[in-house]
């Protein structure tokens, strides 16, 4: 057992070594013990974002067009990308090379040449954990497979934070759905955030049932925001407030977001807490019944600044921990 010093976030990754060299490292898991030492304030952070992918592409034989659709999905580079120079604008296969200034099919803008573009850095438990530590919470972390396969037992943790990032189908595997369903049935609390949770689940009956019946939400829009701005809105939870911004353009710090989910409550005990101001579509919902959930249609780790992440995380953890003055009367 590795020693954990109180008040310091410890992060670990593992690689295999033999005579042939060294393997790619594992994802990074982190752990933190708060100086406050409150046992009921330890969060289990689960990294469910392990996707690596190229950008969305298309091919049309009817009109001889083909290329990459960065506006739909830029993909997810491994750690970072140093080869991307800009979005494609020439899709005609018939367009031939004429000069370095007119490159023909596949020609692209050059506004990102020489820049490092962030991809999946596999360290998001650390980023989420930083915000929790600022609020006085301890945390441990694991991969989604460890939780789904029973290596990690969730029952001893009052809160689970499931990171989904830009994960695609399946966003939450059926086995993990069963694990979370069982955990919540015992009165647990779940925070889940990501770009495709609702949109990718809507076309699959089992996934949709989980979203509606367990998370108590439903899809409002697949492309809910272009500006990357989120505002709080009127709700029974006035302490969840403020304005937040997430990254929508390629940058060296965090993967960029092309589209986010718009969400709606699917239960009378669920409420919208955040909206995208450009169209007033819901960006986040909470449910308070026999268990509590908070579902965000955008990735928490993609928020622009640590202060934004700290502020939003503090509000969400407060929602999970406080006892409401007016007890909800459950209908059996």
What feature does the model see in each segment?
Residues 2-20:
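Beta-strand-rich modules
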Residues 17-39:
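Extracellular fibronectin type III
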Residues 31-53:
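Low-complexity, Pro/Ser/Thr- and charge-rich linker/hinge segments at domain boundaries
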Residues 81-208:
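Helical hinge/lid and interdomain linker segments adjacent to catalytic or ligand-binding clefts
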Residues 165-259, 312:
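A glycine-rich, often tryptophan-bearing local segment used as a flexible ligand/cofactor-contacting loop or short
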Residues 222-306:
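Catalytic beta-strand/loop cores that center a nucleophilic Ser/Cys/Thr
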């Amino acid at each position: 057992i590795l020693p954990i010093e109180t008040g310091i976030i410890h992060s670990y990754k593992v690689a295999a070594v033999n005579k042939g060299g060294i393997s790619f490292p594992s994802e990074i898991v982190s752990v933190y013990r708060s100086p406050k030492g409150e046992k009921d304030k330890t969060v289990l952070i689960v990294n469910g974002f392990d996707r690596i992918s190229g950008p969305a592409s298309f091919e049309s034989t009817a009109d001889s067009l083909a290329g990459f659709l960065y506006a739909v999905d830029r993909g997810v580079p491994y750690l970072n990308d140093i080869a991307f120079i800009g979005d494609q604008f020439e899709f005609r296969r018939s367009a031939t090379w004429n000069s370095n200034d007119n490159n023909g099919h596949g020609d692209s803008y050059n506004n990102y040449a020489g820049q490092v573009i962030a991809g999946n850095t596999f360290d998001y438990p650390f980023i989420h954990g930083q915000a929790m530590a600022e609020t006085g919470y301890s945390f441990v972390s694991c991969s989604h497979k460890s939780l789904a396969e029973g290596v990690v037992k969730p029952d001893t943790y009052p809160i689970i934070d499931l990171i989904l990032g830009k994960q695609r189908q399946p966003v939450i595997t059926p086995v993990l759905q069963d694990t979370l369903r069982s955990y919540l049935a015992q009165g647990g609390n779940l925070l889940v955030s990501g770009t495709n949770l609702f949109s990718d689940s809507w076309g699959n009956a089992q996934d949709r049932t989980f979203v509606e019946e367990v998370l108590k939400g439903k899809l409002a829009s697949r492309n809910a925001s272009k500006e990357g701005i989120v505002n709080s809105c009127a709700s029974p939870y006035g302490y969840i407030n403020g304005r937040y911004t997430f990254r929508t353009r390629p940058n060296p710090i965090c993967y960029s977001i092309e589209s986010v989910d718009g969400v709606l409550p699917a239960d009378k005990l669920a409420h919208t807490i955040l909206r995208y101001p450009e169209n007033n579509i819901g960006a986040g919902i909470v449910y308070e019944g026999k268990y509590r959930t908070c579902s965000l249609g955008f990735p928490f780790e993609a928020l622009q600044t640590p202060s934004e992440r700290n502020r939003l995380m503090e509000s969400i953890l407060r929602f999970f921990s406080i006892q409401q003055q007016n007890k909800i009367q459950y209908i059996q």
